[in-house]
Amino acid sequence: MAKRKRKHVIGKSADMALQKELHRQVGIIYSAAAIALHRYWGWGKDRIISLADMTREVWHECAKTNLRSMPQMLEEETGVEVQCGDGKSWHDLAFLNASIDTFDGKMTVPQFLYMRQQQLRWIPPNVTACILLSLYRRCGFGGDKRLPRIVSQIAGIREEFGNDADALKAACKAETGICVIEYMDSKEAQYYAEA
């Protein structure tokens, strides 16, 4: 019994770390995307909010099943493949293509922790894939030119602000008139309050 409780505590701690990093990366990437869309594409506040709403829909669509990852959904619909910094694709990783089951007790604690460590590294590609898929679906951004261009612009803005979440959040509010992460947080709170 103590072993099972220890496994649960370790798993919960790893899950909390993953959620914390997800929130941080969402703030960084969404803010950079909003700034890029404002600076280079002339988007205003309302259009940015509309895209944020679409990304929530896409995120919830992906979360309904563990059979497809966000990078997989993006590639299947657009032909665009996002990769992690080490050049790995979602094709290479079991936890991104649902070929493992973490809930039936088949994973050991070290295996579970290793999976969570790898998932931490894959947060930016997953968040980016969600934004790109939303741009493709809602705004007709194609995979041949426009999606790669916005990826480059987002990366440039992240670099400009040194991936500083607070600086990006403030710049997003100053430049676009909305703090996207605060908007997203309020929509998530509303979603769970209604559920």
Each predicted region: which residue ranges?
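Small-residue helix-packing motif on alpha-helices
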Residues: 48, 146-147
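Amphipathic alpha-helical segments that form the core helices of the histone-fold
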Residues: 51-61, 150-159
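Helix-turn-helix-type domain boundary/helix-start signal
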Residues: 41, 139-140
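A structural feature that tracks compact, well-ordered secondary-structure segments
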Residues: 38, 137, 148-153
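Intrinsic disorder/low-complexity detector
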Residues: 3-35, 67-137, 165-195
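Long, low-complexity interaction regions most often at the N-terminus
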Residues: 1-2, 7, 41, 59
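Small-residue hinge/turn detector
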Residues: 44, 142-143
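N-terminal interaction modules that seed assembly of large macromolecular complexes
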Residues: 36, 40-59
